[in-house]
Structures are given as C-alpha cells and as structure tokens.
C-alpha cells in the first residue's frame, strides 16, 4: 500500500542527470555551539527564528559524542537576516542552554542541479572529490531529489563552480 511518486528509471535512461551548477553568495553560517541535547530544543530555536520571518536553510545537528549532553546546531540564513537572527538567538540564550552563537558571513553555497539525483549513486562522492582535489573545504552538505549543495568559503565559490562544471558537466557530455 502507498503512493508511487515517481517511476523507476535506469542509470542509462538518466545518464545526463546534472543539468547545472549554481552558487549563492547571499549566505551566512550560524553555529549554535553546546546546545542542550534534549527533545524540543531544535523546535524552540527554529520557532523563534520563524516568528521573526528568518528563513533557514541547510540544517545540520551533530552530536559531539555518544552520551554527550550537548550538541551543535548549524544552519544557514540569508545575509539580510544575519542581524535579526543574531538578536533572536542571543535573546534565546537567556532561556535555552546555548554555549555560543557563532556567525560566519564569509560563506557561499554551491549546488549541482538535476532531476533524479537520488537515483544516481556516486554523484555526491564525485562532487566532494572534485572540491577536495581543488583544496576546497566543505562546511555543510545538503541534498534533495533535484540538488546537492555544499557550503564553502565565499572566496572559493567561483573556483568551486568552475571545477564542478569542468569535472561533472563536461565529463557527462563527453
């Protein structure tokens, strides 16, 4: 029982899965360091941001180690929302145990776009390898059915777009 959302397809039928590379330099990384690791904390954080119309993207929650009572919550916001996000989060620190609010405004998102990314094993690995070979560090990774996005240092985003284009788009057409 259930609903089929898409038909099955073969790798051969979708060989040219990547249709473009995009970048977004209007991005800041927000890191909430040492957040209480208990139910409801993430909801509290994101409800507070939503109440002020701060749009959030690329969310990552990482447990420091097994049994650790703290976690780090990292996400991105648009540059226009940085000041407001900082105000909201600093106010939230009064009621939620958050050790630090760190914001890095020197970030950018680079994405590969194409239909059926989830049906193509290895595409993300290829992207990560290409960035690695160029010495570009990935801060955050986000995936969806149609895209794979990486947060990188803003001063490396043009290099990232170039090497991904050359390594993935040109390779699949050749």
Name what the model sees in each region.
Residues 1-174:
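C-terminal catalytic "cap/lid" subdomain
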């Amino acid at each position: 029982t259930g609903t089929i959302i898409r038909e099955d397809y073969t790798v051969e039928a979708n060989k040219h899965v990547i249709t473009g590379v995009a970048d977004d330099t209007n991005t800041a990384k927000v890191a909430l360091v040492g957040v209480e690791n208990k139910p409801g904390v993430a909801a509290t954080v994101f409800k507070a941001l939503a109440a002020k119309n701060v749009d959030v993207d690329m969310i990552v929650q990482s447990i420091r180690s097994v049994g650790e009572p703290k976690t780090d919550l990292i996400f991105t916001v648009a540059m226009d929302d940085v000041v407001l996000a900082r105000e909201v989060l600093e106010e939230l620190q009064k009621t939620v145990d958050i050790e630090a609010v760190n914001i890095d405004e020197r970030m950018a998102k680079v994405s590969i776009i194409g239909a059926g990314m989830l049906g193509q094993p290895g595409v993300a690995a290829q992207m990560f390898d290409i960035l690695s070979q160029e010495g570009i560090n990935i801060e955050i990774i986000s995936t969806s059915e149609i895209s794979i996005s990486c947060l990188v240092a803003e001063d490396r985003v043009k290099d990232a777009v170039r090497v991904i284009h050359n390594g993935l788009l040109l390779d699949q057409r050749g």
